[in-house]
């Protein structure tokens, strides 16, 4: 598995438009993409700093994992995403190391990335997402 860099930091928010005001207007970070990811029951807004992205996440339903996160911990940093060269190879390597994954097979996330999440129990408390860029 080769880590290519930090792809984005995922931030759970109650209101995308309210949060967008800070990231887009105050910090003047370029908004590049808005997308609903139905499989994860979230709506996203992505801001690109040219050295990594900020992904704002808000729930689309009350049974969304982002909704549960906000209810339990409040808005804030949800996960760190690392880009990998090969998601399937990464999954095999992580399983060999007995790393706990939240999904055994890659899902399609925002921007078409193939994604898998690593349980915080395996990372010292941080939810880590691995993502392979679409070809």
PLM segments and residue spans:
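N-terminal beta-strand motif that seeds the catalytic metal site of vicinal oxygen chelate
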Residues: 1-18, 75-84, 134
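Short secondary-structure junctions
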Residues: 27-36, 99-105
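Amphipathic alpha-helical segments
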Residues: 17-30, 94-97
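C-terminal "cap" of GNAT-fold acetyltransferases
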Residues: 37-53
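A short, acidic/glycine-rich surface segment
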Residues: 32-33, 63-68
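Mid-chain, well-packed structural core segment of small domains
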Residues: 69, 73-97
